[in-house]
Structure formats: structure tokens, C-alpha cells
Amino acid sequence: MQNDFIIALAWPEGMVSACGSWYDVFFAKNKKYRVGHSALVLVESVTGNLRYFDFGRYHTPKDFGRVRDVKTDGDVTIKTIAKIEKNQITNLKEILLEIKKKESFHGEGTLYASILNDVSYSKAYKYAKKIQKNGLIPYGPFVYNGTNCSRFVASVMRSSSPTYIKNARLKFPICVSPSPKRNVGIANANFYRVTEKAFIEVKRNWFESYFKSIERS
């Protein structure tokens, strides 16, 4: 029975340095992209344990990235334990506020988050660790055998055995490549907006979740 969760995270406002690829001349502005950052938290329903994963150019050679979790980077630990009742995370606000305040996650601006329900923690964890064991991985959204933060998050969510429709949307996003905002929108129509002063739940219908950006909802 799959009754675990994945919390999809997005900081869309962050600026990322261009990686020196052929497409930079078309999309980068002043050698920067406004693509933000994407990450995820695996939630094990039995124990309430939380495991953060992301992918990025953290102390790596140029054009390469790596997968982070608590085993490789102790400062990405999440101390809060998830409280789960009736297949719902009841202390989500506490979890997201801890994430929002933690500088080691490298998130800039407003944090957006949503919950992917009824998935397999063990499958997602094994897949993320498998990618991590590859060590240095070519960085970029269109690089052969490479990845970036959004592609990594989408692939881990797919590995957790979500519903057929969500798996298809993650594999074939409307945009050219997975994005932080799109990952949050696919995981769940409803999402959370977290700032320094506010924690807001935004509820959307099926149509809005497909065609309306979380920043405009």
C-alpha cells in the first residue's frame, strides 16, 4: 500500500547563472536565468521522517552538478517530524516554515509547495540515492545524460509511482522542460505560498492547475 508523501518545493524568483550552453544566447539575460530552484521532501508516513533532496551546482566543477541530502550535506537536515492523521500531514505549516527559514536550501523569495499523495517513499528514496551515487552529473535542462534541479525533482516524483495522469504530466510537461512551478502544480492542484510574514493555502480547480501559473493564482 502506497500511503507516503512527497512535498514538491519551488522558489521561482531565484536567478541562476547561465551554464555556458549553446542556448544561453537565446534565453539568458546578463548571463542569468530567472528559473528559480526546485527541490523535494520525502515523507515516510509510518515514522514521520523527512528527507530533503535537491540537485545543483554545489561545490562542483563547471558544467556539473550533484544531488544533495543529509548524508552528503548535513546542513539540509529537517528536524521537524511529520504528524500524519487520516492520510494528511497535519503540521505542514511547521515543516514549511522550517524550510523557508533555512539558508542552506538556497531558496530565494517566496516558497511554493504542494503535496503529492499516495506514493512510495522507498521507491523515491532508492531512485534519488541511485542518481546521487553517479557523483558529478552534467548540468543543464537540455544536456544529454544530464539534468537540472527541476528535471531531477520530476524524475524522483515519477519514480514514486504516482497516478497514471500525474506520471504522464511529469514526463510530458506543457513547457519544454520541467520547471519548479510546473512540478508544484502537477503534484497537486492546491498549493501553499510561504513568505516571511504569511502562510497561505491556495485552492484551485482542475482547469486552473493545468493552465494557470502558481505565481498568478
Q: How would you describe each model-predicted region?
A:
Residues D4-K101:
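Glycine-rich catalytic cores of cysteine/serine-nucleophile enzymes that process amide/ester linkages
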Residues W11, G20, G36, L116-S120, ...:
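N-terminal, helix-rich and Lys/Arg-enriched segments in bacterial and organellar proteins
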Residues V16-A18, L42-E44, H59-F64, K101, ...:
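An almost-null, non-specific background feature
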Residues I78-K130, N134, P138:
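Extracellular-facing segments of soluble proteins and assemblies that are Gly/Ser/Thr-biased and enriched
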Residues Y112-L116, Y125-S217:
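Activation targets extended, charge/polar-rich intrinsically disordered C-terminal tails
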